[in-house]
Amino acid sequence: MLSRKATAVLLAVHAAAMLASQTEAFVPIFTYGEVRRMQEKERYKGQKKSLSVQQRSEEVGPVDPTEPWEEKQEVIKLTAPVEIGMRMNSRQLEKYQATLEGLLREVLPPSRNAQ
């Protein structure tokens, strides 16, 4: 049989888990300092990348503005099926229902039954 302390701890953990599943709040995983360091690293990478692009463009020479400029289009090919999903409780569904319906109308083609 479990001791009273163990039972109290398990009950507290269960209550915290139940409350966490019901809230919509954001729980930070990283501290403010860690986020700031990550942002600085990203900024540094961006500056480094823009410098290398600028150096390459200088090596190629000035671009003639009368020439047509082709934009590089990248296509991402998936090698495995991808499924994106989200879980909502009834309160969240009521709150975001109109927005979700609008997004689905934009993404999905009109069905023949709706006409």
Curated annotation (Swiss-Prot):
Its main location: secreted. GO terms for molecular function: hormone activity; motilin receptor binding. The keyword Secreted applies. InterPro entries: Motilin_assoc, Motilin_ghrelin, Promotilin. Keywords: Cleavage on pair of basic residues, Hormone, Secreted, Signal. Residues 43-72 are annotated as: Disordered. Residues 1-25 form the signal peptide. Pfam families: Motilin_assoc, Motilin_ghrelin. It comes from the Eukaryota. It is found in: Secreted. One of its GO terms (cellular component) is extracellular region. Belongs to the motilin family. Plays an important role in the regulation of interdigestive gastrointestinal motility and indirectly causes rhythmic contraction of duodenal and colonic smooth muscle. This is Promotilin. It comes from Bos taurus.
